[in-house]
Amino acid sequence: LWQSLIAFFCWGMASHAFGAVQDIRADREADIASIATVIGARATTRFAFVLYLAAGLLMATAGWPASAAAIAAVPYLAILLPFLSITDETCETANHGWRRFIWLNFFAGAIVTQLLIS
């Protein structure tokens, strides 16, 4: 159970962090602080990548059937790959990845929920 809870925490942090990347310039202009405005687009995206990876690895140790949910991290990692070298100047391009996340969340969420309640 603890693996699932920590994985969920990592997953949430990764999602919020990457979601903030696309707004770095606008948030800085509005004097809004976020992890992305503090450490920058590239570092935030890489941090999100590590958190998704950690979530997947934690779920892999959770025991069956929860361990099958580890595979759900793979598409998120794949979506982040093109953005690992993003800059603060190109931060708005992260919106393309974020939009993919929104659709993926419907499917991954449904699958993970079914695995965890079974």
PLM regions and their residue ranges:
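Multi-pass alpha-helical membrane architecture of UbiA-family
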Residues: L1-S118
